[in-house]
Amino acid sequence: YVREAYLRGLSLEAEYKINPYKFGLVGASDTHTGAISDKESDYHSKIGILDGTPELRGAAPVTQSLRDQLEEAGANVIVDGFLDIEGKDYIDTGYTEWGASGLAAVWAENNTRESIYDAFRRKETFATSGSRIKVRFFGGYGLDAILDQEDPVKYAYANASTMGSDLLQNNNEAPEFMVWALRDVKRAPLDRVQIIKGWTELSGKPHEKIYDVACSDGRKADSKTGLCKDSRAKVNLNNCK
């Protein structure tokens, strides 16, 4: 829905000259406990007493005593019913769909409140689903020399627009982009980096196209589709590794 909002914003701007969906991105927990769980292995709850145990989240079988208490209390806020799985009772609840939080990542000059809030205001931020990946993105013109620089990031700040800011049209010259991504060493490797282009026709009709700009294992994007073939990496559904 974020990408849909961006496209709607472009359509509204084409029609009304204003874009109410010109926002940056951060990740967060949305918990109601005052505490955060940013790892699935350490996830304890989202709303406290209602889902504060594995049993209440449908992750572990309930005892007969707990089932009796829930049925007597008419706790339909928690329980939609019970499921019999291999002879054991599990709570059937929407809380099974909740999990560890995302993270807000901010490119700030210093680790101070002032610098961090300045980065929020200029939207030089990004969101992750919990892994501590790092992503930088710059756009500009004539950026070919950036790869020859001793400090490409410093050069990009001086000669390009940062993520979240506006990149103005330069006559008919096509913009160039610098993307830098670093995996979380404690999580799975990165499969690919994508740039998603959104634009509108003069009528305001929106369009979207996805480009794979970097892929793992030496894979190259197809010249027609702009996408790489799927990697051979698989996920073990028994342990999610």
PLM region spans:
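C-terminal functional module detector
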Residues: 1-241
